[in-house]
Curated annotation (Swiss-Prot):
Listed transmembrane segments: none
GO biological process annotation, one example: L-leucine biosynthetic process
PANTHER family given in the database record: 3-ISOPROPYLMALATE DEHYDRATASE SMALL SUBUNIT, 3-ISOPROPYLMALATE DEHYDRATASE SMALL SUBUNIT 2-RELATED-RELATED
Name recorded for this polypeptide: 3-isopropylmalate dehydratase small subunit
Similarity comment: family membership: Belongs to the LeuD family. LeuD type 1 subfamily.
Enzyme type, top EC level: lyase
Pathway assigned to this chain's UniProt record: Amino-acid biosynthesis; L-leucine biosynthesis; L-leucine from 3-methyl-2-oxobutanoate: step 2/4
Recorded name of the encoding gene: leuD
GO cellular component, one term: 3-isopropylmalate dehydratase complex
Cross-referenced HAMAP family: LeuD_type1 (MF_01031)
Source species of the chain: Escherichia fergusonii (strain ATCC 35469 / DSM 13698 / CCUG 18766 / IAM 14443 / JCM 21226 / LMG 7866 / NBRC 102419 / NCTC 12128 / CDC 0568-73)
Length: 201
């Protein structure tokens, strides 16, 4: 089973860019592995580093700013995760330490892949995201409280509501990935298999 996601409080980093595609999130040259670990080192590689090997940090890229070290909530603009389909994108984000991405919209495939990997994609309106960017930029180091059960993001006294499909919400809150969902029906599967003719086993 995956880690359960019910509530999360974390440091927010603002990535003020629209249409961030999966090749920017994790460039294609780092996709050789099929395990989920190790991709965080190459997250936003072409933006985070000045050299191809990832040895020289780019001081002008927001993830390298000292005040955002340890951030676990990424604030972004519309159409986050667009481009080619690659599950490595949420792998890289979670391996780096992100638990939540907040944006006005997400590419459909990235959105689905995020839930499969316990990365919560939160959709808020353009106006709300604008407001959050202003808050983060005025208060570097600010933390957001994200409550999946209540479907709320709290920032100080202000609350922002979001909606998640009931099934996906259930899976995240119970730490259920596709394997976990299958194992929930282990008894029924075993019973069905026991009833099959011997030549089918």
């Amino acid at each position: 089973m995956a880690e359960k996601f019910i509530k999360h409080t974390g440091l927010v980093v603002p990535l003020d860019a629209a249409n961030v595609d999966t090749d920017a999130i994790i460039p294609k040259q780092f996709l050789q592995k099929v395990t989920r670990t190790g991709f965080g080192a190459h997250l936003f590689n072409d933006w985070r580093f000045l050299d191809e090997k990832g040895q020289q940090p780019n001081p002008d890229f927001v993830l390298n700013f000292p005040q955002y070290q340890g951030a676990s909530i990424l604030l972004a603009r519309e159409n986050f995760g667009c481009g080619s389909s690659r599950e490595h994108a949420p792998w890289a984000l979670t391996d780096y330490g992100f638990k939540v991405v907040i944006a006005p919209s997400f590419a459909d495939i990235f959105y689905g892949n995020s839930f499969n990997n316990q990365l919560l994609p939160v959709k808020l309106s353009d106006a709300e995201v604008d407001e959050l960017f202003a808050l983060v930029k005025a208060n570097p180091g600010i933390h957001f409280d994200v409550d999946l059960e209540a479907q709320e993001v709290k920032v100080g006294e202000k609350t922002y509501r979001f909606t998640i499909d009931a099934f996906r919400r259930h899976c995240m809150m119970n730490g259920l990935d596709s394997i976990g969902l299958t194992l929930q029906h282990d008894d029924a599967i075993a019973s069905y298999e026991a009833k099959q003719p011997a030549f089918m086993n």
